[in-house]
């Protein structure tokens, strides 16, 4: 039977206590500002919040969970159903360094204005997006995002992040690792 012919699960009654494990209230979500190679850089300060999924990636240590080691251990809704959902919360001028994923990564601003960038060097591109706009990056595309909201320097804004797969992998670009090394050398 092909995927197109696959039968739907039989409908059953879901008790409230069962469904309560699949409900997350934004006000109760907990995130982390640690767990990624660029977490300590001042321009990368951000809180990542794991709502659904983000199992730790399997395999080599050069790959990290897109939401960081801390967050991959604490989803609000602990399911593995082919996608992951989280939020990034940060102030203007903040966001991750360029990185890549092994699956699709889609962004949708909830609040504020965000710049989504892709490629490095001569091929660099970007687009500015606002609430409910959507940018969907394919695997193998170096990408990053940054809060660019004006006139609110101390206000954290929220970006929705959806990433395909059960245990997606992220890897920072060589240029990003050079910036991390430079920062670490200056801290020594």
Model-derived features with residue positions:
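A short, N-terminal "cap"/entry segment at the start of jelly-roll beta-barrel domains
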Residues: 1-81, 188
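Double-stranded beta-helix
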Residues: 2-18, 142-188
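Conserved short histidine dyad/triad with adjacent acidic residue
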Residues: 66-73, 84-101, 139
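Short histidine-centered beta-strand/loop micro-motifs
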Residues: 74-78, 96-101, 118, 126-128, ...
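A structural connector/turn signal
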Residues: 85, 95, 104, 124, ...
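Glycine- and acidic-residue-biased ligand/ion/polar-headgroup-sensing regions
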Residues: 92, 103-115, 120
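Histidine-centered metal-chelating micro-motifs
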Residues: 94-97, 115, 133-135, 139-145
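Short acidic-glycine-tyrosine-enriched beta hairpin
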Residues: 108, 120-139
């Amino acid at each position: 039977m092909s995927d197109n012919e696959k039968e739907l699960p039989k409908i059953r009654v879901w008790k409230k206590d069962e469904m309560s494990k699949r409900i997350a209230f934004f006000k109760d979500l907990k995130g982390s500002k640690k767990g990624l190679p660029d977490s300590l850089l001042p321009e990368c300060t951000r809180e990542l919040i794991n709502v659904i999924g983000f199992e730790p990636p399997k395999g080599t240590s050069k790959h990290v969970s897109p939401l960081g080691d801390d967050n991959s251990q604490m989803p609000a809704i602990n399911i593995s159903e082919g996608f992951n959902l989280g939020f990034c919360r940060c102030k203007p001028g903040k966001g991750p360094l360029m990185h890549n994923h092994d699956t699709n990564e889609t962004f949708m601003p909830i609040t504020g204005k965000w710049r989504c960038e892709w490629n490095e060097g001569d091929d660099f591109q970007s687009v500015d997006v606002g609430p409910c706009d959507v940018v969907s990056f394919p695997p193998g595309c170096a990408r990053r995002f940054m809060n660019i909201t004006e006139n609110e320097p101390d206000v954290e804004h929220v970006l929705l992040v959806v990433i395909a797969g059960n245990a997606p992998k992220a890897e920072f670009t060589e240029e990003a690792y050079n910036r991390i090394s430079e920062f670490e050398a200056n801290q020594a």
